[in-house]
UniProtKB/Swiss-Prot annotation:
InterPro entries: PH-like_dom_sf, PH_domain, PHLA1/2/3. Residues 7-99 form the PH domain. Plays a role in regulating placenta growth. May act via its PH domain that competes with other PH domain-containing proteins, thereby preventing their binding to membrane lipids. Keywords: Cytoplasm, Membrane, Phosphoprotein. It is found in: Cytoplasm; Membrane. GO terms for biological process: animal organ morphogenesis; placenta development; positive regulation of apoptotic process; regulation of cell migration; regulation of embryonic development; regulation of gene expression; regulation of glycogen metabolic process; regulation of spongiotrophoblast cell proliferation. The modification Phosphoserine is found at S3. The gene is PHLDA2. One of its GO terms (molecular function) is phosphatidylinositol phosphate binding. This is Pleckstrin homology-like domain family A member 2. GO terms for cellular component: cytoplasm; membrane. Belongs to the PHLDA2 family. The PH domain binds phosphoinositides with a broad specificity. It may compete with the PH domain of some other proteins, thereby interfering with their binding to phosphatidylinositol 4,5-bisphosphate (PIP2) and phosphatidylinositol 3,4,5-trisphosphate (PIP3).
Length: 142
């Protein structure tokens, strides 16, 4: 099992800007078990993070001769366009890391629900057992 924040992959990918011209900007991507960090090429700039809990899916994969284009769709339905070199398969790496994250979260949710259900069942059984005990009368006799 991987530790949270473990780096799975580093390398170059490009993000399409939100500006009117929609130019492609090179970023250094760092993929971990719970997020994708995008570092600008300039020194001292802060990275942007896409945490997996806010990513819905990786979509719209298209291959051209040189690039693979893909879109990350967030839980608020925002679409962020990326491209990477055809042989780098960043889209597959991000998709697999996202699926792994979602599976881990689903297992945690399942365990939490099961523990809550077991605690509720134990409390109900204890309450039922308490109701079944005869009340003691004077002198400790029922």
């Amino acid at each position: 099992m991987r530790s949270p924040g473990e780096v799975l992959r580093e390398g170059e990918l490009e993000k399409r800007s939100d500006s009117l011209l929609q130019v492609w900007k090179k970023k250094r991507g760092v993929l971990t078990t719970d997020r994708l960090r995008l570092f600008p090429t300039g020194p001292g700039a802060r990275p942007k993070e896409l945490r997996f809990h806010s990513i819905l899916k990786v979509d719209c994969v298209e291959r051209t001769g040189k690039y693979v284009y893909f879109t990350i769709v967030t839980t608020d339905r925002k679409e962020i366009d990326f491209r990477c070199a055809g042989e780098s398969y960043w889209n597959a790496s991000i998709t697999l890391a996202l699926i792994d994250f979602q599976n881990r979260r689903a297992m945690q949710d399942f365990r939490s629900r099961r523990e809550r259900a077991a605690a509720a069942a134990a409390a109900a059984a204890a309450a039922a057992a308490a109701e079944q005990e005869p009340e003691a009368g004077p002198g400790g006799q029922p």
